[in-house]
Structure formats: C-alpha cells, structure tokens
Amino acid sequence: IIAVSTVDQVGSRLLFRGYGVSERMSSVHAGLLGHDTLFLLDEVHLSVPFAQTLAALQQHWRRFHGAPWPDRWGVVNLSATPVVSVDAHPFTLDAADRVHPVLRKRLNASKRAELRPVKVSGDEDERRHGFAQAAVEAASEMVKGGAKAVGVVVNRVDTVRRIAALLEGRADIDVCLLTGRMRPLDREQAVGMIWERVRAGRERASVEKPLLVVSTQAIEAGADFDFDALVTECASLDALRQRFGRLDRLDELGATRAVILARSDDLGQRADDPIYGTALRATWEWLHTLEQVDFGIERLPKPD
C-alpha cells in the first residue's frame, strides 16, 4: 500500500487521535501505520516536530524491545537539511519562568466562555442554516459589546460559507473568510488585508468597523491572530484550546468574551461527528461539569 497524506493526518492516527476516526477504529489506524512501515518524510525541515515524534516513539519502543527485534518502521528524510535530534529532556517551564512578569501574566490570563446549545430541526440543510444563524447572532452580540476583532471558528467549510452569506451586505462590519481549501496565494492576500487589525501585539486603536474573521480549523495552526472575542463551534478539547489561544493572546484586555456553540443533534448519546467522532460530545459534557468554563492556560483543569 502506498499512502500519500499530510503530517497532521498521519501523525494523529499514529498517536491514536486520528481526525475523523472513531474511538473503536483508532487502534486499527495506529496499527496499520505503526508496523512494518516506511515513512518518506518530504521537506523534513518543515516537519521537524513530526520527525522528532517518530524518533521519540522509536526510542520508547526500544526500551521494551531490544536487539533482535527489528525497528517498527523506517524513516527517510527528504530534505537538504535532514538533521533531526531527539532531546531526552522535553521542554518545560521552571519556577523562574512562572514568576517572570510577562509569562506569568499570560499563564494566569482568564478566558471565560459560555456554553450555548443550538436547537436545530428539519433536514440537514435546515439544521446547518439554523446553526449558521446562531453563530452570526453570537458574533453580533460580541460586536455590540465593543469587540473590534471577533473570531468565528467552525468545523466545516459549508458553515463558513453559510455564515458569509448571512453577513453579506452588512455595512457595519468587515468580514474575512479563511479556510484550509483556499489557495496559498489567496490565503496570503486575505491575511495581508487584515493583518494589522488582528496581529498579536498591535495597538488596539479605535477603528471605524469591527472585523469578523470566519474560519475553519485552519486557524488553529500557524496563525498569530489575537481576537478581542471568540465564537467557536464545539470540537475536541485540544482543538478548543488551540482556538482559545487566538483570544487575547498577550492578556492585554484583562476581560474577554467567548461563546462555545454546539448543535443539539451533535450532543445525543449516539452522536458521532464526522470530524471529531465522539470527542465533541465528550468535551461538551465534561465542560458542563465545571463550575466555570475558563480556557486560560492555568485556569482550565485537566480532565480525568
């Protein structure tokens, strides 16, 4: 079998966290990738964390299975700079780091969120439209509250397009759409047009119009955006933490607003999301056990 894929898709499956893979099938995907496999890692200098993960997993396996056993997989690094080392001592914060005034402020920042279920009914088209309407209403609340840069992050490109259609023609706001399906050139142009209004560390001067950035999961990586408020569709816990990392990144606002939306049909006992599987529902249920939902780095407890 020859499989061509991305680092995210392969890495998540190898670690039993495959995107869109159910809990029951996660071991199957990990087993197929984790035994008798040759990884051809293209442009390894752009995928150093994945190369390090492969090497670390190999070392971990060797602790339990020494020499006569062959390696579980091979790796060919296709790059002009293929040097990848594995640090046996992972990076952590020490006591001095935690008392540093800048870092301490960011670690202790509060990012409270409201859990808001969205009642949907009818056929799939009607349910998607109803959810998009709820997202627009939540974002409009943020704008009325004074937020000048609002992130709206949802799980599907179709939802992004529906939200854009509902916002079309509004003269009181600017709207920018970002999805993983955009051509790199189009994405760069779109980001370039809004960069000074969303970059971390900017001067939050008054602007004529608020900006709504409507995006999919594409915003979770490689985007140094800093929103004043956030509206997000519920997802897995790790995905939500990434999204909240785009909210008041430097703790300059002190108090922020965020809403987590979930379709009612995604919360049923048999609900199995095409992207996040049962993790979406499990995350929603776990968040409901908290007295206060706060996605600040040091404020969100670790689930059992």
Go through the PLM ranges and name each one.
Residues 214, 219-234, 256-260:
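A short beta-strand element within the Helicase C-terminal
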Residues 77, 148-155, 178:
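Conserved RecA-like ASCE P-loop NTPase motor core of nucleic-acid helicases/translocases
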Residues 1-15, 202-220:
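Conserved two-lobed SF2 helicase motor
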Residues 183-215:
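Conserved helicase ATPase core of P-loop NTP-dependent helicases/translocases
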Residues 68-74, 78-143:
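Interdomain hinge/linker at the junction between the two RecA-like core domains of SF2 helicases
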Residues 8-67:
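SF2 helicase catalytic motif II
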Residues 137-140, 147, 162, 166-196, ...:
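C-terminal helicase lobe and adjacent C-terminal extensions/tails of nucleic-acid helicase motors
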Residues 3-6, 40-41, 72-80, 212-216, ...:
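Structural recognition of the conserved hydrophobic beta-strand(s) that form the central parallel beta-sheet
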